[in-house]
Amino acid sequence: MSSCKTTLSEMVGSVTKDRGTINVKARTRSSNVTFKPPVTHDMVRSLFDPTLKKSLLEKCIALAIISNFFICYWVFQRFGLQFTKYFFLVQYLFWRIAYNLGIGLVLHYQSHYETLTNCAKTHAIFSKIPHNKDANSNFSTNSNSFSEKFWNFIRKFCQYEIRSKMPKEYDLFAYPEEINVWLIFRQFVDLILMQDFVTYIIYVYLSIPYSWVQIFNWRSLLGVILILFNIWVKLDAHRVVKDYAWYWGDFFFLEESELIFDGVFNISPHPMYSIGYLGYYGLSLICNDYKVLLVSVFGHYSQFLFLKYVENPHIERTYGDGIDSDSQMNSRIDDLISKENCDYSRPLINMGLSFNNFNKLRFTDYFTIGTVAALMLGTIMNARFINLNHLFITVFVTKLVSWLFISTILYKQSQSKWFTRLFLENGYTQVYSYEQWQFIYNYYLVLTYTLMIIYTGLQIWSNFSNINNSQLIFGLILVALQTWCDKETRLAISDFGWFYGDFFLSNYISTRKLTSQGIYRYLNHPEAVLGVVGVWGTVLMTNFAVTNIILAVLWTLTNFILVKFIETPHVNKIYGKTKRVSGVGKTLLGLKPLRQVSDIVNRIENIIIKSLIDESKNSNGGAELLPKNYQDNKEWNILIQEAMDSVATRLSPYCELKIENEQIETNFVLPTPVTLNWKMPIELYNGDDWIGLYKVIDTRADREKTRVGSGGHWSATSKDSYMNHGLRHKESVTEIKATEKYVQGKVTFDTSLLYFENGIYEFRYHSGNSHKVLLISTPFEISLPVLNTTTPELFEKDLTEFLTKVNVLKDGKFRPLGNKFFGMDSLKQLIKNSIGVELSSEYMRRVNGDAHVISHRAWDIKQTLDSLA
């Protein structure tokens, strides 16, 4: 393999010499072939730079982009302004959906199954194929089949496209399919992204007011600033990530170069999708049209959906989640509190319009939610009789008094542990005092923000005719931004940090280090900056009402004082007075001639390099075991039926489906695997045959066709079949060999395929990619083990060993993601089966699935019940 890699690198070395001193290497995701990627250019240069070679598609794309302006002029002259606006709005929506849904689906399947790459390999699109039929491929250039003619055309066209745009030194046959597929994929990305941008710009241009008075104002100035900032973000992002990340290169192959993240990547997470769309809002400000703003919000929101469902899953699967042990300190403290205090439960937290961690047995939760419901209901029923001036005073006084109360508690707690001492002196515990503080702080936030929402809503209702729709939408955007900031803050510092846990439980802190995870990577005190933007959003929504400005100033000042004079001194006392430079600060410092590379960037860089996937190339040897005449799906059903009818007696000696040692063992106690031996006549065998595991009570007397789903409890009979169904259904194949008369193999169903329910089961051998049953095994029993419950230590030992074998134990905690068939209900049944005690799912989630806590808690409950008996 190493010699192949060296040869390939030498063959493509001449193409990459233009990179100068940058020695960039890459490797394919699955086959692990190393190569040097060719020189590529950004979208604008590729399409419009006359000094660069242009392919046919690039010429067509450039022509299509330019034609939009001529079409706009013609439609405007023929049908008028309004029709032209909606005409290009529809076009923009089409291209935006093509971007986020179309490209999203393509990248999703490429990420999971390498669909585009496998398609290119299957149809030999980038291979040298002679004019006669290739002995190792179904591809034939002389065939009269429409499908083969189609793929022959695709092959020639794709090769022509690459040759016409790449330098003469570029030998497409020397490169792996991944890089060639990526180069073709870029062409369609260019078309969609450029059309998306141009149609949006034309729609915005047609929406700009004609009056100079409406254009030259503070909104236009702010809009131009946002547009210029947006341009810088895009340019700086491309400077950092280059074409490789710009065109989603890691969905196709992985570069092994050192990644440098600076500039705009220190300002915001995913800058190309977050602050990289501020230009949308700048153009909306210039137009002063709420319809343009709504279209911009739609485009931006759809981009976030693309990020959430396409890019983020791929990044986590490829590079890992990027979370180190230090950044999880607060989360571990929360786990430790739950572990050491059985009566402790996670506090109720208000996030936006939802409540998290509601406990139906905790009265304070009902009191908090009841307060919100009573205030809202009272407002709705008495809206006409509420005096806004009195309500303003109520909101102002409530905020000020409650903030003074909260600040006093935190200040005295920091100085002398006053709040904790108060409870300890009255017979309560330290954790109990912390729980009461959690209720007080959350109630303070809920009460003040509920009153603010009520007051703002009544303000808008009473002056709705004077409210600008664009201002209303921008205000809601700021509210959404604050909600996002709160969620990101809580995600980064966990419940312990959100509720100022280091004021009350500093003895639980093992590492004196502030987190730099999540939003804290970019801002030192996000709650002081973004934590009040939603309140200023209410100022916009109420058309700059004086009372709302006063409330916004009050919120800002109280927030600033709390952070500056109470929180910061306490943090310095606990963690040490260290100056931490935020990502934004590093970027500002980086504008100087000497750029500074942050520690955070180095950590991300190391994680990315260490997490590069090194998958071995899938073997193709299994498919060669069988004659190709038996792989024709079109004649397969007829072949099976004829064979079953005419030669059943002759073939019966070669039909076998037996469980190993079934004469000795008919009851398999989990996690013991079940090994199955099968034999099938060569005339009946199909590479897509598969074996499913079923409950006997579900299949019943239907012996010819299985009418219930396998639910994932199935295995292929050959490792070369079902390529798009993951490795789990092929790794179970441990043996397969073929003779002139029959094919036989061995399949092992381990804990990744077995049921975790007591019952009687059977295996069914199915023909091809169907549910037609050819063979049925002898019924057998699967049962959960009975763990040793003599002592809590032995019970814990057996439980952890079992969960480890089932692959659902990580760091001593139950993690059902490791085995989709062993969930919370299975764990409950295992414990009940062993010790006779049933723990609730809610409790096990509350202790974060800690095996030590769960086993000892179950054993303690058993002892208590025995003593009561």
From Swiss-Prot:
EC number: 2.1.1.17
Cytoplasmic face residues: 77-86, 209-212, 280-291, 384-390, 461-463, 556-869
Protein's GO biological process: methylation; phosphatidylcholine biosynthetic process
Keywords, in A-Z order: Acetylation, Endoplasmic reticulum, Lipid biosynthesis, Lipid metabolism, Membrane, Methyltransferase, Phospholipid biosynthesis, Phospholipid metabolism, S-adenosyl-L-methionine, Transferase, Transmembrane, Transmembrane helix
Gene3D superfamilies referenced in this protein's UniProt entry, alphabetically: 1.20.120.1630, 2.60.40.2840
Main location: endoplasmic reticulum
Bilayer topology term: Multi-pass membrane protein
GO cellular component: endoplasmic reticulum membrane
Residue numbers on the Lumenal membrane side: 2-55, 108-187, 234-258, 311-362, 412-439, 485-534
UniProt keyword Zinc, yes or no: no
TM segment ranges: 56-76, 87-107, 188-208, 213-233, 259-279, 292-310, 363-383, 391-411, 440-460, 464-484, 535-555
Record localization: Endoplasmic reticulum membrane
Metabolic or biological pathway, per its Swiss-Prot or TrEMBL entry: Phospholipid metabolism; phosphatidylcholine biosynthesis
The reaction(s) this protein catalyses: a 1,2-diacyl-sn-glycero-3-phosphoethanolamine + S-adenosyl-L-methionine = a 1,2-diacyl-sn-glycero-3-phospho-N-methylethanolamine + S-adenosyl-L-homocysteine + H(+)
Residues bearing the modification N-acetylserine: 2
GO molecular function: phosphatidylethanolamine N-methyltransferase activity
Family stated for the protein in its record: Belongs to the class VI-like SAM-binding methyltransferase superfamily. CHO2 family.
Physiological role: Catalyzes the first step of the methylation pathway of phosphatidylcholine biosynthesis, the SAM-dependent methylation of phosphatidylethanolamine (PE) to phosphatidylmonomethylethanolamine (PMME).
Protein's UniProt name: Phosphatidylethanolamine N-methyltransferase
